[in-house]
Amino acid sequence: MIAESGHYALVLALGLALIQSIVPLIGARLRDDALMSVARSTALAQLLFVGASFVALVMLHVNSDFSVANVYENSHSMKPLLYKITGVWGNHEGSMLLWVSILALFGGLVAAFGNNLPLSLRAHVLAVQAWIASAFYLFILVTSNPFLRIANPPIEGRDLNPVLQDIGLAVHPPMLYLGYVGFSISFSFAIAALMEGRIDAAWARWVRPWTLVAWIFLTLGIAMGSYWAYYELGWGGWWFWDPVENASLMPWLAGTALLHSALVMEKRNALKVWTILLSILTFSLSLLGTFLVRSGVITSVHAFATDPTRGVFILLILCLFIGGSLSLFAGRATSLKQGGLFAPISREGALVLNNLLLTVACAVVLFGTLYPLAMEMLADFKMSVGAPFYNLTFAPLFALLLLAVPFGPMLAWKRGDLLGVTQRLLAAGVAGLVVVAIVWAWTRGGSALAPLAIGLGVFVIAGAVTDLVERTGLVRLPLATALQRARGLPRSAWGAALAHAGLGVALIGIVCETTWNSEYIATMKRSDVAHVAGYDVKLDGLFQRQGPNYREMIAEFNVSRDGETLSVMTPSKRSFTTRGSSTTEAALLTRGASQLYISLGDANAEGAIAVRIYHKPLVLLIWWGPVLMAFGGVLSLSDRRLRVGAPKPARAKQRLQPAE
């Protein structure tokens, strides 16, 4: 009965979405407030029914109801409760239900908290959201129904893919989907603006918080996925330029450009057409990512679907929304009035440069992702585009972007003083050069690329600090006055500085890990000692342990340095009998921002085992950077100016009239 309830709740959600996609538009056409208000009630009701459908699937997994095909294929009665729950979205059908649940959540949030929006705009936005929802409800019900029953129910399930039975899966996909789907709000605002033929600074003020929310979650989702791959796959890699990883990076790049473009539009009423186009392209790239994962066109640890019917259906959705939105843009963009002018050397000019570099970088990743797929489809020629391509194309573009980052916030709007900003950034530049010299001397005159990259990271961080120092007057004003100005500084200014500094932190981590990573790969027996980056790693023994739904072989390593024992590390290999597969569970020793990493291979008949030991200097900075960026986004989001909607004109103060 639970399965049937979940199914019919999804059908009712589809019916509500169809009503929401039509009636409010009729109301907007007729200027009927009652019909336009239908969008709000149907969006909230739709959220209720989709939420009920998702809860029903969770209950089926928790109860191990193997009469439902989705539960049978992806669960097991002995699986821990946490992984029963996360197994709901560890498969194609369940993950698509999570996708539409988050889509309904964002629509419900606009309905609930969009009271400051003009009624007509809110009706259009929610109608566009309903178009998207209707398409994906149909996709789930026709090709990917998670509530299908099995005629002769088995007594036990096949279990979830062992690689996905990890705490990271509880966090990574939901965060990623909150980012992917969150950009649908920016898309809907853009289409609504084109339909109404009106876009102004108020529109940018309304759309920026929703874009920022999606960007925060996508940033954290990508970082969490990278860290999950790092510790779960067993060989210490954190980014593989996998097509599905690229599919999450592309909307992040476009979304970052959109945030900065919307800022120009809000402050200077400029870049209107470009901001609308970015809103469309960002969500289009999210849809492309959905197609790559769900269509079966690629083979990846991230990919689920192999049914060609699903791929064709999603391709049709992709063509419908991307093609339709770009056609509407082409027809209506010329009617949008252009905003204010600005000099090339200005904050607007810096943000345009930011958008140019981010867009070109996104195009490079798009080419590297789709070109091999196109070659395989058109010429039956299999090829891959890996790190060497991106190191030669993407990395220089991002280096230029990082070099420009400290200048943007310090330039004035409309017309800036580049020489003056350069002088104010002199201390940050000197700090970067000093670090370059120190690192180059420490590496004894090796390649200059790594020291230069680290110096660039320091320059970005110091530039963010300099911006805050200049805004507060910490150097030129009395301390009490500077602190008072710091308290009055908008949270968005603090957030922007933290986000920019996070980029520098991540760059330093990436450079240190890739340049000075130490590796030891060998077969070890009991009492053997490996020497890695000053650490002595001794294998004390192997033992077996029975887990809830797996058998585990654990190796015990004693780790010491200069004769002092630091830790006992216990990496393992788990064999899952139900699936007949195994996973590697790495052991990590964290010291500061660096880590010692041990993973196991196969054991032989003599009792020896293959071992990988890595020392990864400052590797945690790779993920601390995105966390700092996301925190900066949250701080900006908490700024009251991003929560109250469009600014209202100040009322003129009434003068006191003398008594007659």
Swiss-Prot record:
Spell out the family assignment given in the record's similarity comment.
Belongs to the CcmF/CycK/Ccl1/NrfE/CcsA family.
- Recorded source organism is Bradyrhizobium diazoefficiens (strain JCM 10833 / BCRC 13528 / IAM 13628 / NBRC 14792 / USDA 110)
Single biological process term from Gene Ontology: cytochrome complex assembly
GO CC aspect terms:
plasma membrane
Q: Where in the cell is it found?
A: Cell inner membrane
Chain's role: Required for the biogenesis of c-type cytochromes. Possible subunit of a heme lyase.
> Is Transmembrane included in the keywords of this UniProt record?
yes
Q: Which gene encodes it?
A: cycK
Record keywords, A-Z: Cell inner membrane, Cell membrane, Cytochrome c-type biogenesis, Membrane, Transmembrane, Transmembrane helix
* Superkingdom of source: Bacteria
The lineage is: Bacteria, Pseudomonadati, Pseudomonadota, Alphaproteobacteria, Hyphomicrobiales
Cited InterPro entries: CcmF_C, Cyt_c_assembly, Cyt_c_biogenesis, Cyt_c_biogenesis_CcmF
Annotated GO molecular function terms are: heme binding; heme transmembrane transporter activity
- The yes or no answer to whether the keyword Electron transport is present is no
Segments spanning the bilayer are 8-28, 42-62, 94-114, 123-143, 175-195, 210-230, 233-253, 273-293, 311-331, 350-370, 392-412, 419-439, 445-465, 492-512, 617-637
Q: Where does it mainly reside?
A: membrane
Its name, as the record gives it, is Cytochrome c-type biogenesis protein CycK
Give the bilayer topology.
Answer: Multi-pass membrane protein
